[in-house]
């Protein structure tokens, strides 16, 4: 009996383990069909299959629809063959590797809601997405590749937010890359969670602090302590570094916003730095650290520059 499995999405932090699992599982189950996907294999799928003869195919780019198409293909064999399926690189029975064209970006409102059975997610952080893509072009970031910025329908978003609120989920972490890049979208979501606050659920957002306008700031000021928390990417305060990585951040504005939100006393702020960026030596990084630390965020997170496929 043949089985179709989709292994864990491949990221820089797990690729080595996924590759080893693929090798080992093929030894004990040689008839199994293995597909992998994710950012670490999407951009060089042919090389991945050359390196991993145990893997039958790579899903490149957005995988929701591609994975469904693969399941239909292996289940009934009546769907179009792999040669007509977009968004994949696959190995034919002859061993030849074929790379198909990329799939068009998805309508985000058609992505299924996966949290209907909350028992499966007990004691886990809920990750939720209302937009995909990013309007910026930071050269170290995978999100800058996807220029097609899309938003989930707001009526659908409200319905799903209410589901989380009704179930008293402890935390919902939005994975939107720059949540406040569209003012009306951000305000609608923030107003909704404020008006329907259950006194328990916390919502985490990644925002560009220098894009927060007066209306947004005044709304944030009125929120229950702990209703939202904000993650703000600074990465560096070195102007040469900021220019080199094509980042548009204005640190003076970021600092002003962070201090003002601090004065509200109701929002946990989480600021990020990256070590290893261009033009950033030990002394320069120390200054970036001091600049951010002086803002007194509740959390300062330090990441290290990683070479990401596709970036």
Task: State the predicted function of each range.
Residues 109-263, 275:
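Radical SAM [4Fe-4S] cluster-binding motif and immediate context
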Residues 1-5:
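Short, small-residue-biased leader/transition segments that mark boundaries at the very start
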Residues 11-15, 40-42, 63-66, 104-107, ...:
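Short, solvent-exposed loop/turn segments at secondary-structure junctions
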Residues 183-184, 234, 240-245, 275-283, ...:
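Flexible glycine/acidic-rich beta-alpha junction loops that bind and position SAM and/or redox cofactors
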Residues 6-102:
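Glycine-rich beta-alpha loop elements in corrinoid/cobalamin-binding modules
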Residues 45-51, 216-220, 278-294:
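Catalytic cores of alpha/beta
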